[in-house]
């Protein structure tokens, strides 16, 4: 494998046996592609904004004289970029302008004669834009729109599995679900009649729907039944015989023909009898007259002379009726063919319970059911029924729905109309009856072929369409008012409903979620999440086990492991690593094609619907050199996802990768195959809660997918083009682009500005650090700077810790952990948290609030950290209760006490009419102020601090732009210089000249002169662009801010809090092995090995066997080996051994095992080998891919190479006594994460705080500064102990005895510690409740 310069810095040894056929795809595709489809103009108008506009426009007035036509739309440029929107708290959105045409027709002339056309661009609100990382910035916060897994439109056949009726009879049903419009259900009742429901309302006999479609009884019977024809001749009754129909019946008479008896009376008709009848080609057989009795007439029989109906269709034939028919001259009688086994009389029976008898009565019946209480008219009933399923405005199956519908009914055509046809409805009824007759299967609604993904673009389009429909109503009204001569499209359209619909969706939809920004993995996972909840989806309470369960079709599409614990389990899933959605929204997964037992390089994506037909081998099937299966029988998934053994020539496809089954988070767990699924679930979920540590540390034992996650998450800085690093500092990287990648006529310089110490949604710290040095060559797509939780472009969520599995004085009881003090000293798990606190000055009825340092009744000390504007300094160290922003609020005039009058006389007005409403640091918080931002409303005078900040920002912006200009100029002049020297100028003379003069020189060669002129033009362009950018930045900084109504000023203060690890913090490994720190132990007391090296963490060995997550033990052993090899390399570097020895040792390490990755260090230069060795001093990074990881023999080999015992166990000594522990202990390196459940955020103690208004009891919870509830059971405990005084105190002064607690407070202040308990407020509450029931009750004192 060829490594780039950057990749050579640190190579991860891969144990994967199977070569990677397909690279991990870009992980955010599902979000970005979906939104692109929404925004990009689609010439066909099938999707996105274009589809929404075309579906609503043209809007025609009610009289048809005017219409408003849609021409095209265009999205403008957003005013502020993403970063500015986050700072200002605005939405990152682009204005939508639509070109509309208002056409008036001349009503006096011929139809279609145009009288007037007005065309105009109309503003239609703003559309939020997606950032490059798949998020939206809404009101300054980053949000993610989660994709939804909902039931695909189409038709579904299902059964109640015998649960509805007490007899346990299975009732079948069919449901036609459109993309938008009314649902149509057909269902059998226990009496086997077929009913229909519209929108899950009251049921009607299904034949009413058919009558409403204008079918007569005769036509209905003709569609659903085969006929049996009886012939009357010579007083005999002959029946046309179809032998196959008789199978399984008992003959009620001798079946004979031509004198030969085929079946005797009372015998059961078997296949042998049928064969004999078919062989002799018997087509008619004589039957006794009684045989026709009870059969049902298939059509109306009319007396031809009188026109009177002798026998209506669907009437049972009796002997009298037979006589009448014979009398009326009918020689043949058609009856319905039914039997008890597989041709049921369902439609015939349903017609008997159908109250309607023609189209109108059916329509009226439907109208009554849909609109009870309204008087039906013919037109209203017809209009309602047509609008239900046959109007493209109200009903749309969508392309997906039509495809699913046609597939379900076995129609080959995949496209078709979006509305239902008569054939569609009849087809569904026919298939449902077939299923009831025992032919055909019901659908599995949890099959991923019946559930599809709705992503951002589609949901936004639906919301946009809803907004447009609201506008359409208003426009129609306006058009029908007449007087349209002076009206322009702008006057007709009100953009409010559209922006309201879009805003509501992005701001408050259940699927628009506050982005989980704990670390890069949690960001990626959130964007790849698939929820079954949300509008049009399931609800938590109603979802049963089947929906939540893992389904065979989840394989390679949805992760079977990663899902939340708790009420949402199984309803919120994660996309598998390689999964993608197809055009219809169904999930697909890639497979390698297999031809005649040989695996090809061709890769095909299959959806769950297609996959069912094929036999698919697993990714770990054994292949030879020619990619043929080596085993005679291979374990594969056959039809219906069942596993079985198949011969190689029966196999159609093979999995692409062993990671194919799981999601990104689960694919990051090494040795996942050795963990129990429940623990793996916890491991996958807890990695998302890891807080980025101060210094990221790559995992020694990884899975090889870390790079993809870090790069795709967008937290790192990626090179857009290859080149040479020209300048690096903490906040900027400049790259001089390679000549072959530059566009002619540009400077060829890329500038990357880094994000420094900003706050994430979870209050963690986002900071980017360059990981390249000056002069390094870099390629396109390589990592230039690490973000939070990344190390050299690899995901690094935690730290490698030296762990020992052993008990230690009960400090690791019940999953707690003993941690060495060294971990704290080295700041291994120190994290930075940034909190945003804001202070808002509003305009109130009594006057406006003011931000000032002049606050009443506050001492000098409290104001020491504020400047003259009343805002805290940057760099101030503050703690709970300190004032950050001084603010005073005017208060209403009240009756003054004599003291206040005196104060007013002495100090003037100010002291009395305002109250202190300053922003203070919350109780449990302390930290350093790292930034202050002041936003002032347009037209309000800026204070001194705001002007200072503005000036600073201007300076910074100018400095950045000047530096950018200088870099670009330098690049340009370098090219000018080389051009002039090539044209014959002397370098020394050139250097004496001013650089700008170089551009004025002339060259003899025309081509060179042209080039020089081009460069001169570029130089001018650069200067102009600089001026323009500076002006734009200046405008943005100086302009007033758009604040909420009534807000004059907003001050935001950012506090950085440094949190070291401490007892009570929650930590976890990657295998679901979580625990709380019980004690930070001095290093000298920790167990140590023979070399005197102490362990960092002591874990409880009892946490492993019962939990069955053995992966952590294998990780520990492999981590020990990795560290051992690192130690060896470190020792060799310290001894200054020559490069050849280093190269040889490292080559041994990379060659060990049977991995498919080959690292050839002989192609590396000595310098590259040394740099690689330097980066491996802390340990050799290893990758053990999921389901294809390191074997026991390989782990032992690595341990040997590192000079360590192959048992993975080491003799340890007690740090306190120095004695040897009685047996060797498992010691190694495990990757530990610090989770975002910090004891500082949870610990809380209440002194006097707030009380509930009604009960007067203290509130509960940290947010309310509440107390602990002393509940019913706790009272029992005190009663049981007989602790009467304690009990009295608990129930009175410490709870809700208002007077008692006031007295108690006075007593404590006065130094006497006694209490006078009174009546608790709850007694008053219960008395009031009893009085509210009309019973007077009083408490008497004895």
Swiss-Prot record:
EC annotation from Swiss-Prot or TrEMBL: 2.7.7.6
One protein family per Pfam: RNA_pol_Rpb2_7
Keyword Transferase belongs to the record: yes
SUPFAM superfamilies: beta and beta-prime subunits of DNA dependent RNA-polymerase
Keyword Transport: no
Keywords attached to this entry: DNA-directed RNA polymerase, Nucleotidyltransferase, Transcription, Transferase
Cited PROSITE patterns: RNA_POL_BETA (PS01166)
Top-level EC class as recorded in UniProt: transferase
One of the GO biological process terms: DNA-templated transcription
CDD domains per UniProt: RNA_pol_B_RPB2
Recorded catalytic activity of this chain's protein: RNA(n) + a ribonucleoside 5'-triphosphate = RNA(n+1) + diphosphate
InterPro entries: DNA-dir_RNA_pol_bsu_external_1 (IPR019462), DNA-dir_RNA_pol_su2 (IPR015712), DNA-dir_RNAP_su2_dom (IPR007120), DNA-dir_RNAP_su2_hyb_sf (IPR037033), RNA_pol_bsu_bac (IPR010243), RNA_pol_bsu_CS (IPR007121), RNA_pol_bsu_protrusion (IPR007644), RNA_pol_Rpb2_2 (IPR007642)
A GO cellular component entry from the record: DNA-directed RNA polymerase complex
Function noted in UniProt: DNA-dependent RNA polymerase catalyzes the transcription of DNA into RNA using the four ribonucleoside triphosphates as substrates.
HAMAP family: RNApol_bact_RpoB
Entry's family note: Belongs to the RNA polymerase beta chain family.
Name of the protein: DNA-directed RNA polymerase subunit beta
Organism: Pasteurella multocida (strain Pm70)
Name of the gene this protein is made from: rpoB
